[in-house]
Every structure is written in structure tokens, then in C-alpha cells.
């Protein structure tokens, strides 16, 4: 029998900040490293025949980095800010992450105004729907206003659509018992965003399909 005192606890404060920072560093290091590699090629006198390739690498990686930073500003920024976002603006942020990816995203969110917390939930849910399609497929993100709540839905359909155990734990608000923290923190962050706003988050996973349903009070 497991001792309750030794069971993993949910992170807060510095521990939560460290996990988010680690996630962001992991996301940023690939395009940042590619930019550095391109600059090295430009400086190499023996590789001048590769200048066009180097510039292409730098440009593509810079666009990826800009897209990641813009997304992270909304996905992980302070939810207490008075700033609001339009549906089209949020769709563009998520679309910036799909370039060159295997999964497609159908953004069916109306071009209305969303609070910071609602925007955070929307973009994270859409991102996780695409992340559930490691071998490609189609993801859908939808949102609608009901009398008492904003309802956000996400669906992922593909040949290997699935949730990793770490993601399943995070999406249900459970601590990470084992596995990779980087696979857990963003799903947990979505759960935390929704529940801190007084809402609920439901997730269903079956063969070839994963669905998300969040409700946040208006």
C-alpha cells in the first residue's frame, strides 16, 4: 500500500514556474539552435556555396521562433490581465505552429472577443488536440457562448490519435507519478486554467479519436 505522505504532490509556486520554464526552453531550443547553425554556415569561408541554404534555414527557424513566442505569450501569460483577444487573432497564433506539421487544424472559433483566461484555454486546448496526432490527422477547435458559459470543444482524429499517460494525468488535474514532466505540464496548465476560472474540463480518448470539452463561466 502506498504511503499517502510519499505520494506525488501537485506543483505550485516555484515548482510550477520551473516546469513551465522548462517546457518553454524545450520548445525554443530547436529553432534557436537552427538559427545558430545557419549563422555558423554563413561565417564558414569553406561553406560559401551553402549561403542560400543557410539563409533559408535562418529564415524558417526565425519564423518558427516568432510563432512560438507569440503563442507562449497567450498560452502561458498572466490570466489576470485585462487584455482581450479576438478569435481570428487566436486562430492565427495556433496556425503559426502548424506550418510543416503532420496534423491539420480546422479553427471554427467565431471572431468575437475573449478574456485572457478564455484565450489561454482556447489556444492550449487547440494545441493539445494537434499534439494528440503524432502520425497526422485532422484536429478541430470550436467555441460557442451559452447563457452561462463559454464552451470550448476540441477533437483530434487520426490513425494513431492518442493521449500519453502524462497528458491524461495532467488533463485530469492529477500529479505526475512517472514519466516526462514536459509531457505533463501543458495538459495540467490547461486544466488549471479552466478550473481556476470555475470551469470544468472533460477528455475522452478512444481508438483513433481524442475529444476535449471545457466549460468556463461567462
Model regions and ranges:
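Conserved short strand/loop->alpha-helix "switch" segment adjacent to the catalytic nucleotide/phosphoryl-transfer site
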Residues: 9-19, 102-130, 134, 177-182
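Conserved DHp (HisKA) dimerization/phosphotransfer helix of two-component histidine kinases, i.e.
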Residues: 51-104
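Glycine-rich/acidic phosphate-handling loop/turn and adjacent ATP-lid/helix
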Residues: 148-187
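Conserved ATP-binding N-box helix of the HATPase_c
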Residues: 18-38, 43-45, 117-145, 186-196
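Conserved catalytic segment of histidine kinase HATPase_c domains, centered on the N-box/ATP-lid region
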Residues: 42-54
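Short C-terminal beta-strand
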Residues: 209-217
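Cytosolic coiled-coil signaling helices that couple upstream sensory modules
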Residues: 1-10
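Glycine-rich ATP-binding loops of the HATPase_c
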Residues: 198-205
